[in-house]
């Protein structure tokens, strides 16, 4: 029997410091319909900066 497709979608978290650095993660579209914003470490500028959700192409 085929496995049901889940609610989780792969997303890319892009640094707001415009360094080009990004993280990839998954989020549940049903529980979090809004765009994700989270503060994470950017190793290029060596600081914690805001990362914003973007689609994986």
Curated annotation (Swiss-Prot):
SUPFAM superfamilies: Zn-binding ribosomal proteins. Coiled coil: none annotated. Gene3D superfamilies: Ribosomal protein L33. One of its GO terms (molecular function) is structural constituent of ribosome. Keywords: Ribonucleoprotein, Ribosomal protein. GO terms for cellular component: cytosolic large ribosomal subunit. PROSITE patterns: RIBOSOMAL_L33 (PS00582). The keyword Ribosomal protein applies. It comes from the Bacteria. Belongs to the bacterial ribosomal protein bL33 family. PANTHER family: 54S RIBOSOMAL PROTEIN L39, MITOCHONDRIAL (PTHR15238), LARGE RIBOSOMAL SUBUNIT PROTEIN BL33M (PTHR15238:SF1). This is Large ribosomal subunit protein bL33.
